Every structure is written in C-alpha cells, then in structure tokens.
Regions:
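A short, conserved, highly charged catalytic patch centered on acidic carboxylates
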Residues: 1-121, 129-216
Length: 217
C-alpha cells in the first residue's frame, strides 16, 4: 500500500466543510485501505452509525469509532477536545463512543467491562491531523463519565482515557494498521455474514481448497 499516494490523492480535493472531509475520507482513504488490507470487511465501515447505548458516530468500523471535523479543526486545543468529549453536555465525543460501542451488558462484571472498553478505539480526523483515543489499564480506579450514554457503570474501574495527535502521514500509517485488524471483530450474525458470503474471497478460496482435497482423495 502506497501511503504517500493515498495522501496525495486525498489532498487534491477541496474541503469546503465537514461533509467534504467525510466523503473523501471514505472514498480516498478508508475504502482503498480496506480493499488492499481487509477486503472481506469492506462493508463493515458504516457511516453515521447510531449506537445502541447512545450517540451517532460519523462512522464505525468494527471496534473503531470515527469523529470527522472540518479541515484544520485540530489546529487548536479546543477542536481536539471537542472531538474527544463533544461540544457540550448533549454532544458526544470519542470518549462516549468508545464506551457506547463496547457492547457492555447490564450483568457484565467489572473485569469484563474493562476488557470490552479497552478493545475500543476512537479516531478523529480533520483533513490534516489524526487523533487516536482509547482507554488503557490503570493501577488507579477511576469513575467513568456515562452521563451521555444509555448505560450506567456504577463502580470505579482501573481505566485511564488517553489520546495522541499525529500528523497526516504517521496517522495514516496507524489507521492502516487498525483497519487491517480482524481478530477484534465481534462474533455475531452481522459480522459473520460480512465475511461468509458467495462473493467473499475467503469463501472462494476455501471452496477451492476443499475441491482440490476431494479430487486428491
């Protein structure tokens, strides 16, 4: 995958607003990366995904939640904070999306909740820079803010919320690694059908191997 070529193709566009960023982020960055690195998961990228536990992401891909902003929005700390935590008490940010997208059940024990939340990743993008956010294990217990999501986590958990800002090219390389992942895909009807279907490269290769083995025997 030629990362530099992806960068050049993306930057050829004119970005008048946030919607332009969203459109070309998918068409010029995410889609080519998935076709090259993870084609069987191409239809797992969902734009404006409404999460069951609250919030509507600009997009999701498996355990990754995206928050896309207008060009150069992350040039100021205020823009980064908005991507992370939302504009106000009613607006969601990556912090909320990671929790909401974790698939937490009301009967989950603390250790299960921790594992689920730590699998989540938040990615912000403003056409210039990337913001990568996640929860990591912490020796200190902290109470999570779930005021914006439709679930309640009563107990403080051994988790810390961290983020880092990366320039375009190193951020794009990090994104490529994240999109390549498959081991963190939730095992459910939706994700299974996205991999196991007649047009899937995985299915075609598997059938061919079975056919070859049957011929030999």
């Amino acid at each position: 995958m030629n990362i530099k070529e992806l960068e050049l193709n993306f930057k050829k566009n004119i970005f008048r607003n946030e919607d332009d960023i969203k459109i070309h982020f998918h068409s010029d960055i995410v889609k080519p990366l998935l076709i090259e690195l993870n084609p069987d998961m191409l239809n797992q990228y969902k734009s404006e995904d409404v999460l069951i536990s609250g919030g509507r992401t600009d997009a999701t891909f498996q355990n990754i939640s995206f928050e896309l902003k207008k060009e150069n929005y992350f040039s100021k700390e205020k823009g980064i904070n908005e991507a992370l935590y939302g504009r106000n008490e009613l607006d969601h940010g990556l912090y909320d999306y990671i929790i909401s997208n974790a698939g937490i059940n009301v009967n989950d024990k603390d250790e299960i909740i921790i594992k689920k939340i730590m699998r989540g990743i938040g990615v912000g993008f403003d056409g210039k820079k990337f913001v990568f956010a996640r929860f990591i294990a912490s020796p200190q217990k902290n109470r999570l803010d779930t005021s914006k999501v439709k679930l309640k986590i009563d107990n403080p958990l051994n988790l810390d919320f961290i983020y880092e800002v990366k320039e375009f090219q190193p951020g794009l390389k990090r994104l490529a690694l994240l999109l390549k992942q498959q081991e963190k895909c939730t095992l459910n009807k939706s994700t299974l059908c996205s991999v196991i279907h007649p047009k899937s490269e995985f299915v075609r290769k598997s059938i061919y191997l079975i056919y070859q083995n049957l011929r030999k025997n």
